[in-house]
Amino acid sequence: MQITSAMKMVSAAKLRRAQDAITQMRPYAVKLQGMLANVSASLEQGEGQYSEVRDVKRVLIVAITSNRGLCGAFNNNVVKLATSAVKACEEANQAYAVLPLGKKALDAANRLEWPVAEGFGDASTTLFENLDFAHASEVANEVMAQFADGTYDRVVLAYNQFKNAAVQIP
């Protein structure tokens, strides 16, 4: 009984630390989002390489999940979102590839036999083992490079937005 109580206390402390980190980061994310919106609004349609309008022939679907389970619908919501994006591509006769980031997304891609995007190394399984800005930047830069060089005409992100410990918005 005491071991279970101690484990609950440790888990609660870890959860609180993670929540505090996310809460402290939220103002920066909001400010960054505002800055990006201003830059995007100031560009004329089709002016930048990332705002170019093109016929969508090939889509990259980036599915971001955790590496572990036991987190309720957290991973399932992302897989459902990615599945609906895959179905939309199939209905529109668009080629697609899935970039699974996180072990659960990779498992789903293998189980559902989705074509996995190439050129990202082992990011599917290693990104969240040692998550830092440099590693995440490498993946983001490769996604942007493949969009810029025309490998993909559209990029769809499937992820959860943190609201609180019990609720994540897909």
For each predicted feature, which ranges?
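Conserved loop-to-helix interface motifs that mediate assembly, gating, or partner/ligand docking
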Residues: 1-170
